[in-house]
Amino acid sequence: MGCVRNKIVKRAARTIAEKYFQRLDSTFDHNLLVVQDVAVVQSKKLKNEIAGYLTSLYKKILKGTYNKVYIKSHEEERERKENVIPKESMLDVDCVEVDDVTMEMIKRYGYEGNFKVYGM
């Protein structure tokens, strides 16, 4: 059974993950050094808890199972993928290729358009 972490640890780790995501790693020792450089925490126990939660948080973010952290580079990449415009629209095609069954349905319902049966 895992350790339940308090709000201070979670909030500090989330803030560090948002601001310094590029410096993080999937190892506890590396993240402990990042916490020591970035945060002003006097307690050794609290530093270790933040670094441990930061390590698990980093792994969850890489997997894509944790959505509560806003990382600027990830958001820019997501927007770039969403804004891709195809060179040729599917709606602007002169002739739509359909299979035999679909062509029979089109004729039965009386739809008009430029349909063509493609060969298999």
Swiss-Prot record:
**Gene3D superfamilies, per the entry:** Ribosomal protein S17e-like
Q: Which GO terms describe its molecular function?
A: structural constituent of ribosome
Keyword Cytoplasm in record: yes
Which Gene Ontology BP annotations are present? Answer: translation
Compartments where found: Cytoplasm
Principal subcellular localization = cytoplasm
Q: Does the keyword Cytoplasm apply?
A: yes
Return the GO cellular component terms, semicolon-separated.
Answer: cytoplasm; ribonucleoprotein complex; ribosome
Q: Which InterPro entries match?
A: Ribosomal_eS17 (IPR001210), Ribosomal_eS17_sf (IPR036401)
Keyword annotations of the record: Cytoplasm, Ribonucleoprotein, Ribosomal protein
Q: How does it assemble?
A: Component of the small ribosomal subunit.
- Per the similarity annotation, which family is this? Belongs to the eukaryotic ribosomal protein eS17 family.
Annotated HAMAP family: Ribosomal_eS17
The protein, known as: Small ribosomal subunit protein eS17
Which organism is this entry from?
Encephalitozoon cuniculi (strain GB-M1) (Microsporidian parasite)
Upper classification of the organism:
Eukaryota, Fungi, Fungi incertae sedis, Microsporidia, Unikaryonidae
The gene from which this protein is expressed is RPS17
